[in-house]
């Protein structure tokens, strides 16, 4: 009889534990969704992701590090006005799923401009075009 009650208690504890973890996971996903849905944060992180890919791919295109740092800090400040702490913003940026999502968006950005995966020269040309146009991406590069 006691063994039966122990089994029931363990099953209840497991159910509550799984429910709590699932709720925490959904809460985290919802938190990230608020950052993803904010146009300033989303477009800013796309600018950084594309600029970073250009910088990493092109010897003749350099990052304007202080400008990029200031731009990134403006995104953190904006997220803080939305109620997020710096630690939460850092957790969002460090999240591997989010990093991959922004890499995928950057790849799509290049594909829309006719750059195929592995086409370093194409990436560099897009970078030079962005610099010439004075776009948000171009302002982070030289």
Positions of PLM-derived features:
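Bacterial N-terminal signal peptides that target proteins for export
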Residues: 2-12
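Short N-proximal segments of mature Sec-exported proteins
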Residues: 33-96
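Bacterial N-terminal signal peptides
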Residues: 11-20
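Compact alpha-helical subdomains of small soluble proteins
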Residues: 70-142
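Sec/Tat signal peptide C-region and signal peptidase I cleavage site
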Residues: 20-27
């Amino acid at each position: 009889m006691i063994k039966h009650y122990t089994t029931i208690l363990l099953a209840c504890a497991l159910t509550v534990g799984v429910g709590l973890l699932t709720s925490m996971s959904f809460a985290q996903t919802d938190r990230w969704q608020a950052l993803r849905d904010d146009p300033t944060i989303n477009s800013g992180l796309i600018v950084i992701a594309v600029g970073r890919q250009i910088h990493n791919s092109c010897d003749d295109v350099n990052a304007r590090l202080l400008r990029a740092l200031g731009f990134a800090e403006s995104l953190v400040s904006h997220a803080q006005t939305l109620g997020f702490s710096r630690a939460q913003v850092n957790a969002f940026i460090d999240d591997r799923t989010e990093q991959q999502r922004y890499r995928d968006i950057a790849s799509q950005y290049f594909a829309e401009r006719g750059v195929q995966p592995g086409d370093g020269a194409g990436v560099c040309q897009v970078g030079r075009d962005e610099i010439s146009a004075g776009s948000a991406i171009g302002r982070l590069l030289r």
